[in-house]
């Protein structure tokens, strides 16, 4: 039983690539044909690659390490946030701030600032401060929440990263590689699959296609975490 069926992939439009003039020759092996000036992705290969990525993601989740979901393009933002939250993982869906992985110290300082502002608001400090100052602090808090909210509770560097569109998330991928963090992701016909450790050929511009594949990776995390919990329970018996 495959993780995602051919029917699901077709219905979500995963097979539609980019225009033939916008392509990366390294994607040739994943292209089935060309239709009306658009490349059609070979979904049999997509099914296989989804399964490989699923198995790997599940194994990482079994170790208890966090997995970071990254997708800042409009078509990916909701799926990245929703699916990361569904599997209890972390995400970046607004903008990748340079150094999010490689300059952990600076990012940690900003996260601490966000926590401090949250605490001030919870404890009613905002109610006694001058209105002008509160407006400024709220704006700062909202900005920090927007960019760092999805990673503020991440306990350590991720064991793996999932990305939508490596062209868009190039800096994130470079940082992951520098730290030896494996990267899984969706690659359209204009991408370089060699940038990723586990490349899933597919349409990275259709919301349904992105949601389907991101959802499969989130399910892999849930399955991996459950497996790890069951092992712990058995050990304790």
From Swiss-Prot:
The UniProt record lists the keyword Repeat: no
Pfam family, one: Ribosomal_S2
CDD domains in UniProt: RPS2
PROSITE patterns recorded: RIBOSOMAL_S2_1, RIBOSOMAL_S2_2
UniProt record similarity statement: Belongs to the universal ribosomal protein uS2 family.
Gene Ontology CC entries for this record: cytosolic small ribosomal subunit
Protein's UniProt keywords contain Ribosomal protein: yes
Molecular function per GO: structural constituent of ribosome
InterPro entries for this protein: Ribosomal_uS2, Ribosomal_uS2_bac/mit/plastid, Ribosomal_uS2_CS, Ribosomal_uS2_flav_dom_sf
Keywords: Ribonucleoprotein, Ribosomal protein
Domain of life: Bacteria
One example of a Gene Ontology biological process annotation: translation
Organism: Clostridioides difficile (strain 630)
Name the record gives this protein: Small ribosomal subunit protein uS2
């Amino acid at each position: 039983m495959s993780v995602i069926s051919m029917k699901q992939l077709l219905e979500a439009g995963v097979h539609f690539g980019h225009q033939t003039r916008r392509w990366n020759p390294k994607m040739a092996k994943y292209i089935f044909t060309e239709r009306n000036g658009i490349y059609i992705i070979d979904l049999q290969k997509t099914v296989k690659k989804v399964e490989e990525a699923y198995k790997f993601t599940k194994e990482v989740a079994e170790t208890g390490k966090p997995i970071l979901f990254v997708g800042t393009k409009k078509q990916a933002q909701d799926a990245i946030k929703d699916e990361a939250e569904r599997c209890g993982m972390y995400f970046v869906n607004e903008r990748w701030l340079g150094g999010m992985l490689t300059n952990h110290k600076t990012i940690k300082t900003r996260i601490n600032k966000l926590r401090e502002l949250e605490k001030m608001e919870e404890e009613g400090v905002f109610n006694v401060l001058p209105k002008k100052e509160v407006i400024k602090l709220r704006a700062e808090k909202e900005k920090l929440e927007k960019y760092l909210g999805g990673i503020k509770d991440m306990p350590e560097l991720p064991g793996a990263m999932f990305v939508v569109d490596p062209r868009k998330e190039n800096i994130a991928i470079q940082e992951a590689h520098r730290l030896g963090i494996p990267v899984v992701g969706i690659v359209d016909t204009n991408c370089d699959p060699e940038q990723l450790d586990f490349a899933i050929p597919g349409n990275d511009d259709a919301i349904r296609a992105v949601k389907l594949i991101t959802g499969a990776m989130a399910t892999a995390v849930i399955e991996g975490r459950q497996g790890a919990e069951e092992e712990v329970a058995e050990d304790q018996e």
